[in-house]
Amino acid sequence: MFRTHLVSELNPKLDGSEVKVAGWVHNVRNLGGKIFILLRDKSGIGQIVVEKGNNAYDKVINIGLESTIVVNGVVKADARAPNGVEVHAKDIEILSYARSPLPLDVTGKVKADIDTRLRERLLDLRRLEMQAVLKIQSVAVKSFRETLYKHGFVEVFTPKIIASATEGGAQLFPVLYFGKEAFLAQSPQLYKELLAGAIERVFEIAPAWRAEESDTPYHLSEFISMDVEMAFADYNDIMALIEQIIYNMINDVKRECENELKILNYTPPNVRIPIKKVSYSDAIELLKSKGVNIKFGDDIGTPELRVLYNELKEDLYFVTDWPWLSRPFYTKQKKDNPQLSESFDLIFRWLEIVSGSSRNHVKEVLENSLKVRGLNPESFEFFLKWFDYGMPPHAGFGMGLARVMLMLTGLQSVKEVVPFPRDKKRLTP
């Protein structure tokens, strides 16, 4: 057994007890007669005291930072130490030595740029800040799942090797599939629609791939997509569901990750339900009134969303009813204005984190929608054929986990919140 306790479990009530702890050497101070080691494990940092004359003293006198050790010792209450206790070592076993000097300072005293951090990623992931990020992510994903389970959704898994473009675009990674061309899925969209046509309420948390040329803080070539599809629903039902998901997610993180948020020195935004809605058309007019050169049909990009955020003064808001031709072929038109669609984006300040819509469920309408966009319905026959068999009205959304994590952590780049990000320049580690 490598340990009896995590360092966070040590407390003054254990004074005089013999314990075994294990972890990484976070810092060392040699005061001549004593060596103080800060030992780090998954739960935090604790203090180890090694007295001169002890068998362990010679073992650690030249120990390098980030070496892994097991400490047998006795707990002593000391208000000056982390958690009010320290462990006086009786024996120390060196499990592995770390080479010195380290290519990255895990303590954070010496700052590193993002390229260095990504190159030396394992050491970077040992930093308390990165461990806080990954704990927050775990709680956020758990919250997402739990909310959907409570609403009767079923978790599903869709193919990631596909025959044609899901969105009809060109941002695809081709792969050779037994002599035939195939692609990595850019979205589970078509398959989750089919699944909703069978079991009504489905969701998936899985990787997706887009051959993004954009080298921005908000784009990756490989990302985790959190997708939902719901039968007998429209985009208003979906927006109401998203409000519950985001509300629960933020509050679960605040409740379960109090220490991690302190490490990051950040507080996620408060969610006010209902979340404010502004139509695309009204957003365009508001932007024009502020001197932005934009017209109906244009995308509302990050610079424009910054202006919108400054005017709306809302951390979270929906932009609804986008032009139909600006959305994917499966998006439903508004009955009262076919130029517009039953669609939305959820924006965090100036960053899109969710996109969704009501979906077309009539085959002939879908075929026409494909043709209008210059796409061949025959390429989508595997999808369209099932609309001959009672496809219900349905709606859904896709949520980018990395972007949601920017909202939950206050960090500025998706590369910071993904353990091993993939972009145009990076295939390793």
Curated annotation (Swiss-Prot):
UniProt xrefs under CDD domains: AsxRS_core
Superkingdom of the organism of origin: Archaea
Record carries keyword Translocase: no
Residues where L-aspartate binds: E167, R210, S355, R359
One cellular-component annotation, GO: cytosol
Cross-referenced SUPFAM superfamilies: Class II aaRS and biotin synthetases (SSF55681), Nucleic acid-binding proteins (SSF50249)
Cofactor names: Mg(2+)
Binding-site residues for Mg(2+) 2, renumbered to this chain: E352, S355
Keyword Nucleotidyltransferase belongs to the record: no
Subcellular location: Cytoplasm
Subunit structure, as described in the record: Homodimer.
Function per UniProt: Aspartyl-tRNA synthetase with relaxed tRNA specificity since it is able to aspartylate not only its cognate tRNA(Asp) but also tRNA(Asn). Reaction proceeds in two steps: L-aspartate is first activated by ATP to form Asp-AMP and then transferred to the acceptor end of tRNA(Asp/Asn).
Protein name as annotated: Aspartate--tRNA(Asp/Asn) ligase
Native source organism of the sequence: Saccharolobus solfataricus (strain ATCC 35092 / DSM 1617 / JCM 11322 / P2)
UniProt lineage: Archaea, Thermoproteota, Thermoprotei, Sulfolobales, Sulfolobaceae
